[in-house]
């Protein structure tokens, strides 16, 4: 059914123009940058966790991908591991994001925190199955079942269909460990650029970029960017 809503007034269509916040929680100076962007990220993540904002998920980030047709897409996913090798999240390998990462193995991550933002760009690779299995075993059983149910996702499903598949999978794996689905696992984003943004009063924000000076990403240089 098609409905024409072009002339329908939206409650907040004008309100958003006047929504703004004066950032006064701090500043980011060059002398405050750590040599390693990974350690800098770790420090900011720790600070965000310690704020204990109700409802916040400090490990949530926006993952941006692009199809082979150059059509971008973005969604929020959860960071589940990171080290100097990269940043790992888990998903269905049949999902749109996985399809686009297979076709175009590059991605961008954005963490939006309290008056701070971290943007990371990198190439991607699949996590090996042993690492995926280790993480999968740590998940709640309901989430493990949910991963199997997601095998049946399509462009359109009904709630009843999903509920029936959930019961089917619960019965299938009753009284046994739920195995890792062959279509489910991790992706690792291997950074080649980091940006750290700190909001400041008057919109003269602090923004610094890290770029590697060698192919091993052992050494990085920083530069200040325009707000």
From Swiss-Prot:
Keyword Amino-acid biosynthesis: no
Gene Ontology molecular function, alphabetical: FMN binding; pyridoxamine phosphate oxidase activity
Cited SUPFAM superfamilies: FMN-binding split barrel
Protein name: Pyridoxine-5'-phosphate oxidase
Catalytic activity annotation: pyridoxamine 5'-phosphate + O2 + H2O = pyridoxal 5'-phosphate + H2O2 + NH4(+); pyridoxine 5'-phosphate + O2 = pyridoxal 5'-phosphate + H2O2
UniProt organism field: Dictyostelium discoideum
Single biological process term from Gene Ontology: pyridoxine biosynthetic process
UniProt KW keywords: Flavoprotein, FMN, Oxidoreductase, Phosphoprotein, Pyridoxal phosphate, Pyridoxine biosynthesis
InterPro entries documented for this protein: Pyridox_Oxase, Pyridox_Oxase_CS, Pyridox_Oxase_N, Pyridoxamine_oxidase_dimer_C, Split_barrel_FMN-bd
Annotated function: Catalyzes the oxidation of either pyridoxine 5'-phosphate (PNP) or pyridoxamine 5'-phosphate (PMP) into pyridoxal 5'-phosphate (PLP).
């Amino acid at each position: 059914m098609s409905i024409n809503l072009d002339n329908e007034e939206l409650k907040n269509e004008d309100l958003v123009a006047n929504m703004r916040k004066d950032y006064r929680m701090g500043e980011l100076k060059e002398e405050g940058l750590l040599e390693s962007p990974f350690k800098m990220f770790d420090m900011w993540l720790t600070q965000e966790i310690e704020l204990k904002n109700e409802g916040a998920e400090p490990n949530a980030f926006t993952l941006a991908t692009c199809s082979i047709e150059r059509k971008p897409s973005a969604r929020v996913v959860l960071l589940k591991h990171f080290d100097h090798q990269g940043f790992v999240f888990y998903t269905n390998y049949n999902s749109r994001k996985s399809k686009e990462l297979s076709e175009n193995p590059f991605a961008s991550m954005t963490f939006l925190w309290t008056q701070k933002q971290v943007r990371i760009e990198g190439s991607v690779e699949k996590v090996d199955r042993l690492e995926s299995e280790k993480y999968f075993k740590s998940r709640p059983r309901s989430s493990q079942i949910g991963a199997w149910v997601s095998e049946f996702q399509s462009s359109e499903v009904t709630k009843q269909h999903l509920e029936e598949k959930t019961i089917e999978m619960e019965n299938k794996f009753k009284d046994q460990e739920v195995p890792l689905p062959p279509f489910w696992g991790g992706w690792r984003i291997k950074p080649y650029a980091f940006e750290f943004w700190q909001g400041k009063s008057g919109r003269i924000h602090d923004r610094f970029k890290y770029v590697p000076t060698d192919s091993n990403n052992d050494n990085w240089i920083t530069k200040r960017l325009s707000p």
